[in-house]
């Protein structure tokens, strides 16, 4: 199994005259069409078996598509004008920047999946289960799918079937270093009340600029502020929502998921959801995980592959760069 990571927005961008802090019209953007047959043939000849398409699900971006009902995200909670591909705005949508015709973005994604399959390779995409964008709003979810947080009890920090964690009666405070942006225009502000916990487990209304302040932590039924107690007596609401998202992309022809920060989501969810997925789909699951003591738990939950940066990668780096003994491998 040889995986090629392909960041779509940079792969096909031939613009070499880049402007610092420039927008799409100035710096350009790759598209699915940029991944042409010549590129696919070259990857096939290289021995690639799986192409990992990075940054395809719609995420925070300061580029607006009003004709699609998509607004630009607030600069106070957007990392760079192009946005972080791990700050998801709509789990059921494709980044319109990556399409020749933004109205046709889903079909253009399905086309690249088909063309990769025609070359005898498989498709992996990112699945970001731990957090989503602060301004998340789905414009493309199926009619029978409810939006995140619609029925949450916002008067408590935790409830099993809440999708988010809350800081009751407290307003979200933009990191101080970013608030200077607001002075450039009196129209720029961001209001969130009550504040929601940030993606890197910051259960406070005042994340720092080094936190994942642009994202909101999803609630899988663990009460982190009360002894990490688990509330899995019945399936939490978030579990059903996230399983449905993976099923949606499998139906689009996706063969597997590189799961972002899988270790921040309870292993019990993976055991349940991977079993549910594999009742229907032959899906590959790859976990981003940096805690070796958890490796076995996540493999036994159904993951096919895990990152081994902390184990093998760091050991090899220490041997090559710092003179560590080779018998430490």
Model segments located where?
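Short, well-ordered alpha-helical packing segments
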Residues: 40, 92, 110-117, 125, ...
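Short glycine/proline-rich turn/loop motifs
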Residues: 11-24, 88-97, 204-234, 238-239, ...
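Active-site-proximal helices and loops of the catalytic beta/alpha 8
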Residues: 143, 159-162, 166-172, 177, ...
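Aromatic- and acidic-residue-enriched segments that line the glycan-binding/catalytic groove
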Residues: 59-88, 129-211, 298-310
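Active-site beta-loop-alpha junctions enriched in small/polar residues
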Residues: 9-11, 56, 128-130, 262-264, ...
């Amino acid at each position: 199994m040889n995986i090629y990571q392909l960041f779509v927005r940079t792969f096909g961008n031939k613009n070499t005259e880049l402007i610092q802090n420039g927008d799409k019209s100035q710096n350009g953007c790759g598209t699915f069409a940029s991944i042409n047959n010549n590129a696919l043939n070259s990857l096939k000849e290289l021995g690639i078996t799986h192409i990992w398409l990075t940054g395809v699900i719609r995420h925070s971006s300061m580029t607006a598509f009003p004709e699609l009902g998509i607004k630009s995200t607030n600069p106070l909670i957007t990392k760079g004008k192009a946005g972080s591909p791990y700050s998801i705005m709509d789990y059921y949508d494709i980044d319109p920047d990556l399409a020749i015709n933004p109205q046709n973005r889903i079909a253009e994604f399905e086309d690249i999946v088909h063309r990769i399959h025609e070359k005898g390779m498989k498709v992996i995409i990112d699945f970001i289960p731990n957090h989503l964008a602060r301004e998340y709003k789905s414009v493309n979810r199926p009619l029978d799918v409810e939006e995140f947080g619609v029925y949450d009890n916002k008067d408590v920090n935790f409830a099993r079937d809440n999708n988010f964690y809350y800081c009751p009666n407290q307003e979200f405070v933009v990191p101080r270093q970013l608030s200077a942006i607001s002075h450039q225009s009196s129209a720029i502000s961001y209001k969130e009340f009550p504040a929601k916990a940030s993606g890197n487990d910051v259960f406070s209304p005042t994340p720092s600029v080094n936190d994942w302040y642009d994202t909101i932590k999803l609630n899988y039924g663990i009460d982190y502020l009360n002894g990490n107690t688990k509330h899995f007596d019945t399936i939490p609401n978030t579990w059903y929502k996230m399983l449905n998202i993976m099923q949606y992309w499998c139906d689009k022809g996706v063969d597997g998921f590189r799961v972002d920060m899988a270790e921040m989501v309870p292993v019990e969810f993976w055991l349940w959801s991977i079993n549910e997925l594999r009742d229907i789909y032959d899906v590959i699951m790859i976990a981003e995980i940096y805690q070796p003591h958890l490796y076995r738990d996540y493999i036994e939950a159904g993951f096919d592959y895990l990152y081994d940066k902390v184990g093998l990668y760091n050991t090899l780096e220490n041997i090559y760069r710092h003179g560590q003994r080779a018998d430490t491998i």
